[in-house]
């Protein structure tokens, strides 16, 4: 049907549109629309009608041209936003950041993406069809779409028609796909151009076609960036920043390669595109900060918990007093005290805040940030806050963004894989390369700084200090002074990122060795699961057999039933070799090999049924015990006799690097930045392994004193689960071994461990009654002793030993005995010596010789402490002797001493004897009673002893703290100026 132009001229625009819509012929409708467009230029209805017709005709190239006309027409501003958001709605479930929050942070997801007004609607009953249709109706995005649709009610007919054709054509999808196809075609054409068989003319034609295609492709790319920016501008005006950043992240991900190519380009013809990409990026940064400012206030974040740090040891007591006073005032005002669950919740919120906002910054800013100059930030002056009432003076710097990008990598505490390390390595390498122009040096190896965190992390640290130990290599003058300052600032930031990353990785690799027996990190060979009823940590390693039955327990589990852990260090290697042999056999097709496979599988099943688990390791360090050795003593150190396996040697390398980086970071110019990292980013229980490695590095390198009390929050037990205390016990054990300055605190730590773990019964034998003959004394009581560690060496140096509950028990008792010895508590030492009698026998006889005044005959024995010697010169004093001493050989020796005329003060205050013979009779009666009592065993006595000792030291500590607190209160109130008050205080203290 032909279009009558004269008739059309006489019709109004409404009539023309009605006629177009009623037309059943697409060609007629198109002709009417084209002719009417010449009469009514830029009419919005005719424009969108033409757009609709082009889609129906499947002429998508024309559709894109018309879509850009719609985009440039201000009347379609909201419609364009609607199109973009509908595309986002379709893609949203596949977006990394959206999925990350949805899966990991439900509470934050509700606050950010869920429309509270729609919650009731979403929760109400509705038909299944409606639920399928509106599966995301609870999102704020749905509210935004509804609002836009209502504002576009005058275009509802066209929007509905276009939506019905969406399966054939979506402008955003078409542009993205077309861009990728053009890139692939250009690459293919470039490959063809390199073919020697192509003629020169063909090459010219192809080059021309490539240029045209590239220009068109680049124009569409820039238009897409502009399209997204305008859509995000609309969202930001309505404070919907969360969807702005999703759009920015989506487009940045789609054009990652193109953006990287242009941002790195130095070609003159690419500079215009490069500047527009930067404008897009800066607008994205602005949206990210607006998003963070909005939702960080809605997500309740408490300040980090107070921590005792290595750095401020001198003024720590003063700060602690101030904090205690402030806490007391707050408690009086509130009338209640926050419990540990609330504090843990606050710390979790802090961690959530870190990951919630660092992830999008990291994904959006890298690697673009490395190609942005500081001056560009200063010129654009991007603000950290926006909106009414905001602080417009706070601007964002380049290094601030770089810092946030880096922190994302080191805030993930519970799973460090090869992929994680390579991401950190890539970041550090890109950052180092971005500062090449600031470094002036004649040595290219210094300029081309190469970082390899997996295979040679020590070299990265050494190379960093080498490149900064030598001069700039250039002449110093005023012109270069600014460059020198910029270079210095850059190197400082590179240092904090590199050294902290090395500390982070080396700590994990050392910890991995402790748990799995190997510090190697290979692809997908380690997973961490931090959730059982006891919050146990499971580390699965490729080196260990993963085919065990569920009934035999999981490999690598840290548990309190550690009998299976008492194996040699070489068992794992043997098991690995067996498994490798089995795998090799499985690859053969011979019948004999199949038979071998069956045998091997049977062997594996037998091993699994035995519940074998990988060895755990720990460091032992007998500093207190060997501090009795002076320079003049003859002492044969057995440390050279200890043979470290390859895996142990590798683990010590990581521990050494951990210590070196820690020492580096505790110096200027990094100490303040490192404090902030420890007090915020790493101030969380999931970084227990990092503090574990830091503690071990201190123990290994003999950093004795109060600074071995690592910063683990205001209450040490909050960092570990008290229901599964094995790791916590091991930490306290090492503190007890090395803490010279607070012996009584170490004793409390050790006693808490000993109460929490089980003491196994000693080897049993047939019970026998006591008779007066000495030969009959060799009975059950004599045999009641525990099995000591098989890894005891006479050395002052630390070394690795098996980590098991039995090993913890031995070293706790051993360390407790040395703590008692340093306090001169000889009787308490004697009680502990019964637990491992054969091991401590020689030391017990040193005490006996000291009582008798007999000099030590063996110069290689560790001498008793000076305080023990001084007390024994007065006499052996232990009023609880008959409550806890049941070892027959000990009792015989004390009878022998009494026969020699030496005095023992071992009776209660209300008991007296007239002669040593009477005391001997009491001891013999004691032997008779104890041997006839089957319930009187070493484990029972030790448990009773540990509880009694802990109560004693806790009461003593409480009284000491009360006295300290009352003294501080008096000093702060000024009462201490009164002579009367001072006099009364002295009387109280003397009492």
UniProtKB/Swiss-Prot annotation:
This is Integrator complex subunit 10-like protein. Keywords: Nucleus. Residues 180-217, 310-345, 462-484, 549-614, 961-991 are annotated as: Disordered. It is found in: Nucleus. Residues 473-484 have a biased composition (Acidic residues). Its main location: nucleus. May be a component of the Integrator complex, a complex involved in the small nuclear RNAs (snRNA) U1 and U2 transcription and in their 3'-box-dependent processing. It comes from Dictyostelium discoideum (Social amoeba).
């Amino acid at each position: 049907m032909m279009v009558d132009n004269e008739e059309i001229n006489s019709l109004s625009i409404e009539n023309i549109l009605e006629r177009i819509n009623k037309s059943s012929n697409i060609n007629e409708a198109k002709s009417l629309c084209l002719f009417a467009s010449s009469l009514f230029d830029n009419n919005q209805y005719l424009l969108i009608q033409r757009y609709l017709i082009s889609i129906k005709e499947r002429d998508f190239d024309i559709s894109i041209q018309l879509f850009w006309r719609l985009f440039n027409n201000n009347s379609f501003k909201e419609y364009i936003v609607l199109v973009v958001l509908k595309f986002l709605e379709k893609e949203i479930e596949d977006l990394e950041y959206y999925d990350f929050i949805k899966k990991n942070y439900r509470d934050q997801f509700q606050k950010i993406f869920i429309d509270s007004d729609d919650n009731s609607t979403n929760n109400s009953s509705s038909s299944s069809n409606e639920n399928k249709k509106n599966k995301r109706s609870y999102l704020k995005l749905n509210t935004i779409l509804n609002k836009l649709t209502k504002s576009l009610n005058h275009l509802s007919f066209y929007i509905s028609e276009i939506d019905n054709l969406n399966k054939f054509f979506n402008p955003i999808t078409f542009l993205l796909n077309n861009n990728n196809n053009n890139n692939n075609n250009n690459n293919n054409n470039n490959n063809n151009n390199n073919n020697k068989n192509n003629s020169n003319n063909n090459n010219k034609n192809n080059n021309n076609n490539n240029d045209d295609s590239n220009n068109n492709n680049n124009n569409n790319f820039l238009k897409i960036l502009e399209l997204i920016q305008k859509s995000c501008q609309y969202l930001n005006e309505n404070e919907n920043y969360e969807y702005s950043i999703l759009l920015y992240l989506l487009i940045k991900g789609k054009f990652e390669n193109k953006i990287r190519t242009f941002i790195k380009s130095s070609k003159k013809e690419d500079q215009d595109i490069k500047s527009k990409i930067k404008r897009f990026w800066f607008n994205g940064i602005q949206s990210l900060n607006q998003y963070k400012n909005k939702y960080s206030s809605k997500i309740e974040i408490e300040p980090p918990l107070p921590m005792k740090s290595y750095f401020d040891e001198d003024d720590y007591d003063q700060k602690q007093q101030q904090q205690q006073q402030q806490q007391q005032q707050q408690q009086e005002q509130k009338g209640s005290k926050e419990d540990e669950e609330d504090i843990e919740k606050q710390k979790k919120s802090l961690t959530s805040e870190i990951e919630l906002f660092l992830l999008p910054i990291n994904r959006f800013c890298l690697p673009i940030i490395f190609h942005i100059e500081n001056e560009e930030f200063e010129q654009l002056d991007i603000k950290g806050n926006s909106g009414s009432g905001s602080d417009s003076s706070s601007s964002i710097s380049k290094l601030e963004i770089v810092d946030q990008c880096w922190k994302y990598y080191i805030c993930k505490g519970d799973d460090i894989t090869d992929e994680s390390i390579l991401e950190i390595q890539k970041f550090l390498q890109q950052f180092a390369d971005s500062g090449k122009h600031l470094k002036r040096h004649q040595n290219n190896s210094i300029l081309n700084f190469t970082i390899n965190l997996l295979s040679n992390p020590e070299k990265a640290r050494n190379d960093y200090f080498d490149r900064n130990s030598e001069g700039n290599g250039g002449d110093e003058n005023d012109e270069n002074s600014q460059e020198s300052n910029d270079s210095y600032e850059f190197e400082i930031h590179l240092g904090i990122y590199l050294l902290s990353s090395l500390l982070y990785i080396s700590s994990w690799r050392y910890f991995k060795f402790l748990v799995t027996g190997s510090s190697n990190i290979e692809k997908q060979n380690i997973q961490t699961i931090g959730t059982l009823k006891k919050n146990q940590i499971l580390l699965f390693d490729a080196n260990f057999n993963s085919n065990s039955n569920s009934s035999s327990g999981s490999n690598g589990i840290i548990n309190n039933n550690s009998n299976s852990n008492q194996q040699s260090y070489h068992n794992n290697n043997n098991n690995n070799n067996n498994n490798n042999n089995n795998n090799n056999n499985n690859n053969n097709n011979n019948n004999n090999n199949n038979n071998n496979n069956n045998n091997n599988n049977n062997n594996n099943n037998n091993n699994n049924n035995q519940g074998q688990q990988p060895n755990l390791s720990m460091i032992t360090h007998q500093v207190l015990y060997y501090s009795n050795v002076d320079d003049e003593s003859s002492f044969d150190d057995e440390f050279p006799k200890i043979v470290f396996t390859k895996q142990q040697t590798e683990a010590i390398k990581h521990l050494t690097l951990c210590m070196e980086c820690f020492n580096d970071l505790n110096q200027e110019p990094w100490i303040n930045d490192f404090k902030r990292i420890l007090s915020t980013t790493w101030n969380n229980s999931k970084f227990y392994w990092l503090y574990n490695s830091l503690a071990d590095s201190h123990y290994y390198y003999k950093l004795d004193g109060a600074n071995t009390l690592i910063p683990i929050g205001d209450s040490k037990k909050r960092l570990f689960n008290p229901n599964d205390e094995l790791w916590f016990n091991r930490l306290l054990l090492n503190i007890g071994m090395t803490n010279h300055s607070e012996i009584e605190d170490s004793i409390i730590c050790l006693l808490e461990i000993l109460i929490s773990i089980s003491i196994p019964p000693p080897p049993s034998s047939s019970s026998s009654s006591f008779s007066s003959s000495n030969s009959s004394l060799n009975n059950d009581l004599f045999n009641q002793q525990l099995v000591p560690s098989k890894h005891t060496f006479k050395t002052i140096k630390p070394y690795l030993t098996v980590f098991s509950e039995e090993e913890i028990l031995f070293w706790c008792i051993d360390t407790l005995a040395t703590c008692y010895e340093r306090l001169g508590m000889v009787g308490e030492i004697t009680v502990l010596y019964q637990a491992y009698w054969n091991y401590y026998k020689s030391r017990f006889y040193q005490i006996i010789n000291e009582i008798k005044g007999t000099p030590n005959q063996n110069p290689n024995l560790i001498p008793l402490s000076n305080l023990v010697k001084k007390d024994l010169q007065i006499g052996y004093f232990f009023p609880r002797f008959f409550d806890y001493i049941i070892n027959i050989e000990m009792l015989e020796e004390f009878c022998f001493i009494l026969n020699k005329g030496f005095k023992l003060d071992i009776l209660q205050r209300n008991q007296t004897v007239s002669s040593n013979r009477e005391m001997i009779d009491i001891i013999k009666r004691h032997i008779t009673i104890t041997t006839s009592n089957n319930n009187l065993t070493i484990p029972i006595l030790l448990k009773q002893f540990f509880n009694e000792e802990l109560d004693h030291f806790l009461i003593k500590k409480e009284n000491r703290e009360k006295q300290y607190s009352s003294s501080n209160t008096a000093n702060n109130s000024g009462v201490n100026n009164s002579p009367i008050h001072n006099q009364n205080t002295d009387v109280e203290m003397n009492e």
